[in-house]
Amino acid sequence: MTTKLKNASNLSESAQVDQQSVQPFTRSQKVYVQGSRPDIRVPMREITLDVTPTDFGGEINAPVTVYDTSGPYTDPNVVIDVRKGLGDVRSAWIEDRGDTERLAGLSSNFGQQRLADPELTKLRFAHVNNPRRAKAGANVSQMHYARKGIITAEMEYVAIRENMKLQEARAAGLLKQQHAGHSFGASIPKEITPEFVREEIARGRAIIPANINHVELEPMIIGRNFLVKINGNIGNSALGSSIEEEVAKLTWGIRWGSDTVMDLSTGKHIHETREWIIRNSPVPIGTVPIYQALEKVNGVAEDLTWELFRDTLIEQAEQGVDYFTIHAGVLLRYVPLTAKRVTGIVSRGGSIMAKWCLAHHKENFLYTHFDEICEIMKAYDVSFSLGDGLRPGSIADANDEAQFGELETLGELTKIAWKHDVQCMIEGPGHVPMQLIKENMDKQLECCDEAPFYTLGPLTTDIAPGYDHITSGIGAAMIGWFGCAMLCYVTPKEHLGLPNKDDVKTGIITYKIAAHAADLAKGHPGAQIRDNALSKARFEFRWEDQFNLGLDPDTARSYHDETLPKDSAKVAHFCSMCGPKFCSMKITQEVREYAANQRIEAVDVDVAKGLAEQAERFKQEGSQLYKKV
């Protein structure tokens, strides 16, 4: 997966899937839950657990169902060929609605130019359909359907997906314990229904990013009353990285749990790279269109025009991009407010638009043409991700006048988008110390009327280059608890360089931890099922189950094997931290056995006496380390 473009043969003939991304997870199987029609098949991952040994034969542990973003890549029954892309999930749903039309060809000038260039043949994805667009006068957004009282197939799909077979889990006893959460005003029901999904989308509190030209998509939902989602970034740059490498990063990222992926490519062949990514992506793809627009004017921000940007939006919408980051809130009057900052404007998109505004001394053309942008968005059902171009790039600049001024403008733009029934989420910081994070969330809810919040971290301190996945993971967990709907991952390479596959995985796992911690704290129904199952496996020394229930089984198994590499250690009733004689869980088990043998009903027996007797018994039995399984 490391062949550079200059050495590439025809990608439509040579491209191969990243083999690491298609390996099934140990003791896991892909399962599908069918909806009201045969073609609504919602994927989940089911983890099979070992039997707990008992004196009477064994206790069966029910399988645990977990959310699965990996798409068909981890289904052994699906043949993956990245040259042809993934299978079609949504075309029948879209056609049945009867409000779209198939175009005769691409309608963007740039798209037509790229298609006509014979030099690009060897790089081009070969199996591209003509795009769809809304019929004249039609609005094909999920918000428009929701406000008309229509429950779409996409809405039913995400309702099934969010529940993760919760009723079956309760019946199997997997949720005997779950702490009450504190949701800070979120309205999370005990069960997610299609009607609840429709209501949340109609209200603007949630979005389903689902471009009608991204038919390979497995729909998902972003909103404060649903599971906290994470986004992973990929994309080439002028410094290198091939199309195959970016597709490999995509498949690798979704394997580990990236709910959406943003293609932030800024180098050559942006158009072709994006086509390969979308055709092979089961998750929503987001972009920052101003990056490509800037490439078209050779990096000179002053030369950007509305007409060129409009063509870029149509080009990307016809490829199937699900959400656009658009920095329409960077207004001319806000730019001087950044002069006194420690780190000024750190957003690439924000700095591009600030430079354009100052060069022309005119208002941001993304702001002045916002209604026209909405017309494009609703013709393809592209969601807004309103960019925070003035986000703080250091904790010193957090919550300043420029940041919150822009946020108020984003609230104004949100209401304009909603008048067009266009789905919308709001991007947030950035670098914010812990004590100022809740103010960010509260102000966003107030200004943007509960539109989903999507933040980059935030990083809670600036002193740890190389560890900013940790500095930001702390802030991400906090703001996710307070109500943030999606967290944009940060890798260890943040501020330092382009992430490789290992960095991508580290960033995603860090953010899956933050998102899950937030779900637990909010009291999301069923959030504690996996924790309970892993804790039980840990107490019962079911090592393989501990590995397989974890977010990263490979690393857990590797760390265990560094100290205890033999297979016999997988049935040991101790770990390398405490050893056999000092394992608290082993001692607790023996105390419980003692209590049961003495017919003491309460577990709070004379612990000192119990421990002394068990210690003597351990010595008399020859300090036996293992129990037969």
UniProtKB/Swiss-Prot annotation:
Catalytic activity: 5-amino-1-(5-phospho-beta-D-ribosyl)imidazole + S-adenosyl-L-methionine = 4-amino-2-methyl-5-(phosphooxymethyl)pyrimidine + CO + 5'-deoxyadenosine + formate + L-methionine + 3 H(+)
The keyword Iron-sulfur belongs to this UniProt entry's keyword annotation: yes
Binding site for substrate: N233, M262, Y291, H327, S347, R348, G349, D388, G389, L390, R391, E427, Y454
A Pfam entry, by short name: ThiC-associated
GO biological process: thiamine biosynthetic process; thiamine diphosphate biosynthetic process
This protein's record includes keyword Iron-sulfur: yes
Entry's Gene Ontology molecular function annotations: 4 iron, 4 sulfur cluster binding; carbon-carbon lyase activity; zinc ion binding
Binding-site residues for [4Fe-4S] cluster, renumbered to this chain: C575, C578, C583
Region (Disordered): 1-30
Cofactor annotation: [4Fe-4S] cluster
Cross-referenced Gene3D superfamilies: 6.10.250.620, Radical SAM ThiC family, central domain
GO cellular component assignments: cytosol
Record note on cofactor: Binds 1 [4Fe-4S] cluster per subunit. The cluster is coordinated with 3 cysteines and an exchangeable S-adenosyl-L-methionine.
Domain of life according to the entry: Bacteria
Pathway annotation from the record: Cofactor biosynthesis; thiamine diphosphate biosynthesis
Alphabetical list of PANTHER family matching this protein: PHOSPHOMETHYLPYRIMIDINE SYNTHASE, CHLOROPLASTIC, THIAMINE BIOSYNTHESIS PROTEIN THIC
UniProt family annotation: Belongs to the ThiC family.
Subunit annotation: Homodimer.
Primary role: Catalyzes the synthesis of the hydroxymethylpyrimidine phosphate (HMP-P) moiety of thiamine from aminoimidazole ribotide (AIR) in a radical S-adenosyl-L-methionine (SAM)-dependent reaction.
Name of the featured protein: Phosphomethylpyrimidine synthase
Organism: Pseudomonas fluorescens (strain ATCC BAA-477 / NRRL B-23932 / Pf-5)
Gene: thiC
